[in-house]
Amino acid sequence: MGYFISELTYEELAPLLTEEAVIVLPIGGGSKEHGNHLPMGTDYFVTDYVAQEVTKRCDVLTLPTLPYAYFPAFVKWKGSVSIEHKHFTDYVQDILLSFVRFGVRKFLIIDGGVSTHPPLCLLARDLDNSHNVKVAVSDIRGLAAETENELCTQKQGGHGDESETSTMLYLHENLVHMDKAVEEYSEEFPNTIVNGHRKIYFSSRMNTLNGINGNSTLATKEKGERILQAMVDSICDFLKEYIPWMPEAED
């Protein structure tokens, strides 16, 4: 079992900040459109839940969930907050370096976004080279991929879809408006994705009428429970190896 840093006193936290410690930073958008049926804080709710469950099972020190990040595909949707990617990575770096200066060398970012993943991975590489610390970054597209493939029948998805709606039905059913759930799919530029494989990167924004990509009408609470459990299990499986492991000392 781990600890939530915000619940500890300074006297309790200070001796835990060792070279062997793993600091967890969850990141999930707290104000980002998810269609007309899901709350703006969907990413935050899901990421925060996963972080809480991981902390209950693993010997980690978990920071409060960061609710604002880099979400450029949603800047045209009212109320959706996006932090410019350089500001975002600088901010996250400052958070991590606040612990590096006291000897911590291992971090895990629980990343609840898609657009946040590339800049966070670049930051992880930079900190490895500059400070010899390891920053692992979870990938929301892969954490529960096998379970989603088993349970979900939508032809494609990615935002406010069958999977995401299912997780919110499990976590906060009172915030989900299934009477407004729809099936709609965002359009990709021709020949950038072929047979499910991305061939060419092509910048795009959320372009559907209701702001989702997938079939949210197929969502169920039962699917959501299993998908969330798979996310937690994937991270805990990684942490079993990561917690006892130490980065090599520099020459």
Model-derived segments and their meaning:
Residues M1-L108, V114-D251:
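Extended, histidine- and acidic-residue-enriched regions that form the cofactor-binding/catalytic faces
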